[in-house]
């Protein structure tokens, strides 16, 4: 990774979870087994992200205009504070 840290920032994590939760609430197929305790779209999206199942690419850029596309499977998840 040439741009940014080797982990998902809290802003990237929030955006990914929000986008995926919206997709799930609109009827997108879920990538994990859903139980009664995992019925909330946000909880499902968080679990999918933790398991590394989301085929999403994070785009990072600098003020100079350089862009780097990074699949989230190459980014580490930081523990929640």
Swiss-Prot record:
Gene Ontology molecular function, alphabetical: DNA binding; DNA-directed RNA polymerase activity
Organism: Thermofilum pendens (strain DSM 2475 / Hrk 5)
Role played: DNA-dependent RNA polymerase (RNAP) catalyzes the transcription of DNA into RNA using the four ribonucleoside triphosphates as substrates.
EC annotation from Swiss-Prot or TrEMBL: 2.7.7.6
Protein localization: Cytoplasm
Any one GO cellular component localisation term in the record: DNA-directed RNA polymerase complex
Protein name: DNA-directed RNA polymerase subunit Rpo6
GO biological process per UniProt: transcription by RNA polymerase I; transcription by RNA polymerase II; tRNA transcription by RNA polymerase III
Catalysed reactions, as listed in the record: RNA(n) + a ribonucleoside 5'-triphosphate = RNA(n+1) + diphosphate
Residues spanning the signal sequence: none
PANTHER family: DNA-DIRECTED RNA POLYMERASE SUBUNIT K, DNA-DIRECTED RNA POLYMERASES I, II, AND III SUBUNIT RPABC2
Family to which this protein belongs: Belongs to the archaeal Rpo6/eukaryotic RPB6 RNA polymerase subunit family.
Swiss-Prot/TrEMBL keywords: Cytoplasm, DNA-directed RNA polymerase, Nucleotidyltransferase, Transcription, Transferase
InterPro entries per record: DNA-dir_RNA_polK_14-18kDa_CS, Pol_omega/Rpo6/RPB6, RPB6/omega-like_sf, Rpo6/Rpb6
Pfam families from the UniProt entry: RNA_pol_Rpb6
Assembly, per entry: Part of the RNA polymerase complex.
């Amino acid at each position: 990774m040439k741009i940014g840290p080797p982990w998902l920032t809290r802003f990237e994590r929030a955006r990914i979870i929000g986008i995926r939760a919206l997709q799930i609430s609109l009827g997108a197929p879920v990538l994990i087994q859903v139980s009664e305790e995992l019925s909330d779209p946000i909880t499902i999206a968080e679990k999918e992200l933790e398991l590394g199942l989301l085929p999403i690419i994070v785009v990072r850029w600098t003020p100079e205009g350089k862009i780097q596309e990074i699949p989230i499977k190459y980014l580490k998840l930081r523990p929640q504070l």
